[in-house]
């Protein structure tokens, strides 16, 4: 069964190892094939936008997902998650789900779980900033001083 994808004007999508850019009008595609990685632009992180530990994990999983040889990213991935679990042990259930999906070869589901890790990280940051307002003010001072 073909996957139906609707693209907004100028939206990009990765199909396999190709980037497809839509023109200035909406487009509807039917993609037929098995085990072809497909990522919409909104789901793609770049090294520049992967600016937190959880986003770096997502980037590593994303690179596994689109790579013909996902194992090339395993070292990076496992180093990142080791550091996260050491710093935030409560993240283990999410990391475990990502790990299981990677080991089972379900990299798309691992990518979805990596999104949950990003959301969890954002939740923890929000809680920290709510209870440590000075930390947020210090962060603003550093960014304006640069």
Swiss-Prot record:
Provide the alphabetized UniProt keywords.
Bacterial flagellum biogenesis, Repressor, RNA-binding
Q: Does the keyword Cytoplasm apply?
A: no
GO terms assigned for molecular function: mRNA 5'-UTR binding
GO BP, one annotated term? bacterial-type flagellum organization
What does this protein's UniProt record list under function? Has a post-transcriptional repressor function in flagellum biogenesis. Associates with the 5'-UTR of fljK mRNA and promotes its degradation.
HAMAP family, A to Z: FlbT
The family line of this record is: Belongs to the FlbT family.
Instruction: Please identify the protein, giving its name as recorded.
Output: Probable flagellum biosynthesis repressor protein FlbT 1
């Amino acid at each position: 069964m073909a996957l139906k994808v609707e693209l907004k004007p100028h939206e990009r999508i990765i199909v396999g190892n190709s980037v497809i850019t839509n023109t200035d009008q909406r487009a509807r595609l039917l993609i037929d094939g098995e085990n072809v990685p497909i990522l919409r632009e909104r789901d793609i992180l770049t090294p520049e936008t992967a600016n937190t530990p959880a986003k770096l994990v997502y980037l590593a999983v994303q690179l596994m997902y689109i790579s013909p040889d996902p194992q090339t990213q395993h070292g990076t991935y496992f180093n990142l998650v080791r550091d996260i679990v050491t710093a935030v042990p409560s993240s283990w259930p999410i990391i475990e789900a990502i790990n299981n999906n990677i080991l089972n070869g379900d990299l798309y589901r691992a990518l979805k779980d990596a999104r949950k890790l990003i959301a969890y990280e954002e939740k923890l940051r929000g809680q920290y900033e709510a209870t440590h307002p000075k930390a947020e003010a210090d962060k603003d001072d550093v960014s304006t001083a640069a």
